[in-house]
Amino acid sequence: MINQAAIMAWKDNAPWVHAAMVEQDLIICKALVCIFGDEFLASQLAFRGGTALHKLYLTPQQRYSEDIDLVQIHPGPIKPILLRLGEVLSWLPDKVTKQKRYNNTMLFRMESEVPPVQPLRLKVEINCYEHFCVLGLQKVPFKVSNPWFDGECKITTYALDELVGTKLRALYQRKKGRDLFDLQVALQSGNLNVARVLECYQRYMEFVVDKVPTYKQYVQNMEEKMQDHEFLGDMDLLLREDAGRFYPTEAYKQVRAAFIEQLPGKRE
């Protein structure tokens, strides 16, 4: 789908370990321009998740990310959005749409162009139930300049503090070391308002659970993960080629001091 010269040219923007990852990164970037360059989709969808953090705020991108996470801004029928999304992404092959009550997913499958040939999969997932925003939606300029594709748009997304607040929720909810990495990088950017991050975390956590985890529950959750090999090794192949190692123990110390120690609950 993409000539090898264009993929290699993109490596300056996406210095990932494998050429297939560079190719996927370029595909993601074109897809973002196609989605948010469309007036209808830009008014209906907001970009969220790790890919949004690294593509829009934590630049240059510190880790590889393979999916596009979107949120339906307003409650309403999802079918018109899915139809238009399929149209603007019609250049991607083998589309499969999976619909559930709270999220809808489009999967595209292809093979990499640079040997050794590897299967590639792009997942575009739409959260269809969190129709709210704490700090207001943002419009962030985004540009792709490559021999294969050249384009730009303004991406509808959330404020940095809100994206990081949802990351703090994700760190508790799932077992992926990349969430810990993202929080550390966000802290090191020096651009965070920790009080606003915690406000957003509280709002998003309240939306999905009856009782927000206490300080003690969050610490226990993290201490279990810090003994889990899958969690600790999640970042092994996701770092830039020119990056140093990721040290989860040090990252946890920083994230705990900045965020977790501010959570309500007894200290024992």
Regions inferred by a protein language model and the residue ranges of each:
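Structured mid-to-C-terminal alpha-helical surface segments
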Residues: 1-45, 56-63, 68, 72-268
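Glycine-rich beta-strand-to-loop/alpha-helix junction loops that act as flexible
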Residues: 47-52
